[in-house]
Amino acid sequence: LLLALLVALACAPARANAAEVVLLHSTDRDDARTRALARGLADALTGRAAVVPVLLGRRERGDDYFDSRFETLRRKFGERSPAVVVADGQAAFAFVRKYREDLFVGSPVIYCSMPAPDPQYLRQCGDCTGLPETADPAATLKLLFTLRPQTGLIVGIMDDSPETDTLRRVSEEAMEAIRVQGLGQARMLFPGHEPGDDAGLDMARLRAVASSVPRAGAVLFLGFPDLEGEEAGNEGEAVRQLVSRSVGPVFAASDRWMGSGVAGGVMVPGRELGAAVGALVLRIMAGEPAGEMLPEPVTPRPVVDMTVLARFGVARELIPADAMVLNEPNRPQEPAGAVSTGFAALALAGALAGVYLLLRRRAGRKDRWPGPRP
């Protein structure tokens, strides 16, 4: 008993001082992507550090909001310096740069879920490296036409941010290239962001747009503004409205919405990104300075929901070989050692025929009985 107590006392400080990796998300809400990223990171660390996720908030919140989040986190973490701080998205990266002298002092930083930042921003975050990532709506459009070449209309949904406006221009250029290559001849429009229709989208207008998408159409979701007041809404609610009201499939360039009725897109799966972040964390924990690591861009790949695509008549054979396939319908399999249905039916028919012949033979012997009947 005394030995067990001594072992427990010796281990207690080690547990209390276990390495921490703080994962700052640039969102207010937990969703499929934040969970997948945290899970992939934890799996990669294999217990060598604890992952502490924090829903920091989206950047539209403003300075006062992030000042209050800083005070909350300072009370929570005190003087603790995590082994690594992971900034998931631009809001988290800006937060770390602004408060690094007072929070998580001396902790190396890894950024992800955002394009490569300006070099001056890298200098502001101290010992820093990252996994640059850029949304690829052009590849998502190519995937869309691979799966549904008959698509005649692409309805783009976007917010008012400069980043999303860039994605729109990339999408329009990609659509023109698709036309030139003869891969598709669809029209593309962005309701609320067209000449003569430039007032943006609210939730009521979004519902009307979703209901007007034809069967030969599809939706390309790039973003949606977080609204307040009577028509309050957010991206999650926008996706739900699109999926429930549109008779055409919805495609996106982020796996944040996979599993909620989105058909697919070309993206970096959250769990794979978490594993890549985890590999960098382990190198840092082994003593390699983060600032000396070259940023390693992550490559998106097709991700599709086969259950959703099946509703639109998309055959499994059209799915790219490198795609991550979610929710693939199970094919019925016969248990090992089971006899096939056709063979069983043939065997039954043979058995019945044998019984019939046996009865006929016995009846024939009765008709030829040599003596008087019993």
What are these regions (language model features)?
Residues L1-A10:
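Bacterial N-terminal signal peptides
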Residues R15-R373:
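Short hydrophobic alpha-helices and adjacent helix-cap/hinge residues
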